[in-house]
Amino acid sequence: MRATTKEQGFYSQIFKLVLPIVIQNLLSAAVNSADVVMLNYVGQSAISAVSLASNYANILFMVYYGLGTGATLLCAQYFGKGNMRAIQTVEGIALRFSVIISVVVAGIAFTMPQMMMRLFTDNAELIRIGASYLRVMGVTYLCWGITEIYLAVLRSLGRVTISMAMNMMAFALNVFFNACFIFGLFGFPKLGATGVAIATAMSRVIELIGCVIVSIMSKDIKLDLRYMFIRNKLLFSDFVKLSLPALGNDLSWGVAFSMYSVILGHLGSDAVAANSLVVVVRNIGTVLCFGVASAGGILLGNVMGEGNLEKAKEYASKLLKLTVVTGAVGGLVVLGITPFVLKFASLNETAMHYLKYMLLINTYYIMGTAVNTTLIAGVFRAGGDTKFGLICDTIDMWCYAVPLGFIAAFVFKLPVLWVYFLLCTDEFVKWPWVLKRYKSGLWAKNITRDHLFEDEEKE
């Protein structure tokens, strides 16, 4: 692999990584979106309740993504350096954090699901449906925290097909069990939103079992919880310094983005129902963009781990150009899917009106997301620059987008679509600062260390 980054060209390497990651991201989005799509056959209240409850899964995903980012950027560079022992240690550190967080959130979901729903809505029916859904989803959170870290480590080593296979399996099982619990197939009871939560939990449990099987067959990188107890002060310090800003960045952005749902949730169930389907379509439109960002981050990490910073800058330039293309493609995908979504959706007239124009707004919004994700989460993080994203996104979301949304909705009482349009300006506001940081080249660093385990060997 270390020779590969030196001998092969950028595009040949990036496309080998992109396709499996895109398929994985598409399936990962599909696993979470299948709940909302299939609940279309149950009713608008079920869609709205699950859409609001899913905000917790979205926030948790941001947490796991932040932890996985710290693991990925360290593991990618140490893989470029050829240090497998360091990779195992980093995996254990990431698992330690993810398991603790998963247990805490699952415990709250088991015991206080009504309280969790009241943060998003005061509608009694939505609270009842969402609470039942969340209580079962606690099982999903426990499994998810483990599998996301293990698959992130495998991706950082370029083993992206394994992650793709795991997500394909989870998606297929989720859709199958969803159908069983929604339509009562094969003798299963019709359980509506609760059945969808059970289906998701079952698919995640089986995905975890699949990861354990992969681990048993692997010669070097195992899914071994004993890794959590490996102690290395230098790597722990590096992981915390890199992961905490990334985790803070993703949490800050994720919670702020959930505030969009809070705003829309208080503008009526029609806005919530429309937005729940828009999120599904937007996730499909952005999978290629996120795939390029993830693949670029892995490739740049390997190159910088080898110490070739100039080549990393050259690759980053090509990656940005590729991102603009994928952003345009993503917008066209949303535009192309829109007629089918409008034909498929079973919403009332007002919600359908919102849905149509929200989808059109997202045809350009994806370009802003694509550029920022590639630079902040791909290029900058590959070189260990995680603090910039934290500062940039926190200011953008909490000082601009969220206050703007609340003022537009509750002070000026603008129409729903105007509120949504203003919320969707968040990505473009930060472009000047993100592009300035990219052009500075300050993100290009080799963050690996030599002689990590010398003190242990002396003892």
Regions found by a protein language model. Give the residues of each.
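Hydrophobic transmembrane alpha-helices of multi-pass small-molecule transporters
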Residues: I59-M62, N174-N178, L208-V212, I284-V287, ...
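Short runs within selected transmembrane alpha-helices of multi-pass transporters and secretion channels
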Residues: G68, M137-S156, S163-F171, V196-C211, ...
